[in-house]
Regions:
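Structural motif corresponding to alpha-helix initiation and N-cap regions
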Residues: 20, 65, 86-89
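Non-catalytic C-terminal accessory region of glycerolipid acyltransferases
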Residues: 86-226
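Alpha-helical membrane-targeting segments
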Residues: 1-17, 65-75, 151-155
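Short gly/ser/thr-rich secondary-structure transition/capping motifs
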Residues: 13-21, 83, 142-145
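A secondary-structure boundary/capping signal
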Residues: 22, 35-37, 59-60, 105-106, ...
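Short amphipathic alpha-helix with an adjacent loop that forms part of the alpha/beta core around
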Residues: 24-26, 93-94
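Catalytic core of membrane glycerolipid acyltransferases/transacylases, capturing the structured
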Residues: 13-14, 26-84
Length: 226
């Protein structure tokens, strides 16, 4: 996995021009869940390259084919079936238990990136691992009315901002489902708020909202376990 860090850095700083803020918000040790907004297929790699710590990102299982699949496997990324993949969540939990970092794009599909809705996988992971969640705002990877599959030209300016970490836990007398719903709402609110703050700081807006969602993105997965 070590070789993938320079590759991620090169994508952010040689192919594109990525400004990064909030690195000091990322815990320097122990497990961390990075939860980013999702507007482009580049979001996962850009978040990976901007992070001060290496991470394993949940990637749709269909990407693990051929040469790209070998690269993803060798760099430590995690295949996930987004229709519901408890095994992927358990693998992520095991990595967090070992003090590693996991990246997830909990909106689940590419869209406007406002984090108006997220899936339950990130909440399950936070509650069952105890790892802090760092909201990550990713801006510039898609803009205006660019298509969901748009490939930005080299040299475009991106912005990645790491927000304040939040730690979630179960409350006394709270059911598993209630804990999941509350945790998901707290993560969603933190991510949405951080995206708004990053827009004001960087001056880079989100793309226009699309009426149809694409289902071929790096994402988390819903979890019904309590």
């Amino acid at each position: 996995m070590a070789w993938s860090r320079p590759v991620g850095w090169a994508l952010d700083h040689l192919v594109y021009r990525t400004s990064v803020t909030g690195k000091s918000n990322v815990p320097t040790g122990g497990p961390v869940i990075f939860a980013g907004n999702h507007i482009s297929f580049l979001d996962g790699p850009v978040m990976f390259g901007a992070s001060p710590r290496p991470m394993h990102i949940l990637v749709k299982q269909e990407m693990f084919k051929g040469f790209l699949g070998r690269v993803l496997t060798a760099s430590g990324q995690l295949p996930v079936d987004r229709q519901g993949d408890r095994a992927a969540l358990q693998r992520s939990k095991d990595l967090l238990a070992a003090g590693r970092c996991v990246g997830i794009l909990p909106e689940g599909t590419r869209g406007s990136g406002e984090a108006s809705d997220i899936n339950g996988g990130v909440a399950w992971l936070a509650l069952n691992s105890g790892a802090p969640v760092v909201p990550v705002a990713i801006l510039g990877t898609r803009a205006g009315d660019e298509h969901l599959d748009f490939v930005p030209r080299p040299g475009r300016r991106f912005h990645v901002s790491f927000g304040t970490a939040l730690t979630l836990g179960r409350r006394a007398g709270e059911s598993g489902r209630a804990s999941m719903d509350r945790a998901a709402q707290e993560i969603r609110a933190a991510l949405a708020g951080h995206v708004r703050d990053a827009i004001q700081l960087s001056g880079q807006p989100l793309p226009f909202a699309e009426t149809s969602k694409d289902l071929t993105a790096v994402a988390g997965t819903p979890a019904d376990d309590h």
